[in-house]
UniProtKB/Swiss-Prot annotation:
NCBIfam families: tsf (TIGR00116). Keywords: Cytoplasm, Elongation factor, Protein biosynthesis. Residues 79-82 are annotated as: Involved in Mg(2+) ion dislocation from EF-Tu. The gene is tsf. Belongs to the EF-Ts family. The lineage of its organism: Bacteria, Pseudomonadati, Pseudomonadota, Gammaproteobacteria, Alteromonadales. InterPro entries: EF-Ts_dimer_sf, Transl_elong_EFTs/EF1B, Transl_elong_EFTs/EF1B_dimer, Transl_elong_Ts_CS, UBA-like_sf. GO terms for molecular function: translation elongation factor activity. The keyword DNA repair does not apply. One of its GO terms (cellular component) is cytoplasm. It is found in: Cytoplasm. This is Elongation factor Ts. It comes from Shewanella sp. (strain W3-18-1). Associates with the EF-Tu.GDP complex and induces the exchange of GDP to GTP. It remains bound to the aminoacyl-tRNA.EF-Tu.GTP complex up to the GTP hydrolysis stage on the ribosome. The keyword Cytoplasm applies.
Length: 283
């Protein structure tokens, strides 16, 4: 049976697949449109299953403000090339819109967009993963995206410009907590034990070692907290001092970076070439 251009166009419009894939699917089903769609969906699911084991550590961070809250979303792919692809970004923004509409939980988002994800994997040829969604509440919010890879939202009592600058600082300096006193007790205890051991190994007298540990702990909690860090725009001041001058306060923040915490496969190009040469000699 001859397949018409109109049939190919209809299948392409309905599936988003490539023209040649659509033509082939229609030829295999003798022009049966619905069967062609079913077969393409099955094929796409199989391709997605094969890609599921591939490490997806690239991608994008998106942010959208709602009423009294903001949502940050991370969607991953395997390469920076696909991270800029219009189809990938369209998918990610669709997920973001649904998340922002009603604070949808991550697992529910994954389930809702699984069919679209599978179709996208089949079309693009890379593993795609809706990895994280975070919500932050606040009457006053400021957001900042550094390129496509880092997203920050800060909430607090301050003017828009001040909160925006603090969001930029968070993007650059990666604080883990708002204030030094917010550092959890178990984190403090673990670091304190380490510093005591270091001081003892240095052979310091007990009274001096104790003072050294106090100083080091103050530095430690300051470096991992927002208000204790040196402010990137005025390094002689801490963020806390800058906020005090402005009569401002930060109550919370969220920072997401693409791929953080994902163990990536290290590519050794020289070893790969050597292996290929060795294999060719055996052939």
């Amino acid at each position: 049976m001859a397949i018409s251009a109109a049939q190919v166009k209809e299948l392409r419009d309905r599936t988003g697949a490539g023209m040649m894939d659509c033509k082939k699917a229609l030829e295999e089903t003798n022009g049966d449109m619905e069967l062609a769609i079913d077969n393409m969906r099955k094929s796409g699911a199989a391709k997605a299953a094969k890609k599921a084991g591939n490490i997806a550590a690239d991608g994008t961070i998106l942010i959208k403000n709602g009423e009294g809250f903001a949502v940050l979303l991370e969607v991953n792919c395997q390469t920076d090339f696909v991270a800029k692809d219009a189809n990938f970004l369209g998918f990610a923004n669709s997920v973001l819109d649904v998340a922002a509409a009603s604070k949808v939980a991550l697992e529910d988002l994954k389930a809702q967009f699984e069919e679209a994800r599978v179709a996208l994997v089949a079309k693009i040829g890379e593993n795609i993963n809706v990895r994280r969604v975070e919500y932050i509440d606040g009457a006053k919010l400021a957001s900042y995206r550094h390129g496509e890879r880092i997203g920050v939202v800060v909430t607090g009592d301050a003017d828009d410009e001040t909160l925006k600058h603090i969001a930029m600082h968070v993007a650059a300096s990666k604080p883990e907590y708002v204030n030094p006193e917010d550092v959890p007790a178990d984190v403090v205890t673990r670091e304190q034990a380490l510093q005591i051991e270091i001081s003892m190994n240095e052979g310091k007298p007990a009274d001096i070692a104790e003072k050294m540990v106090v100083g080091r702990m103050k530095k430690f909690t300051g470096e991992i907290s927002l208000t204790g860090q040196a402010y990137i725009m005025e390094p002689k001041k801490t963020v806390g001092e800058f906020l005090k001058e402005k009569g401002a306060k930060v109550t919370n923040f969220i920072r997401l970076e693409v791929g953080e915490g994902i163990e990536k496969k290290e590519e050794d190009f020289a070893a790969e070439v050597a292996a290929q040469i060795a294999a060719s000699k055996k052939a």
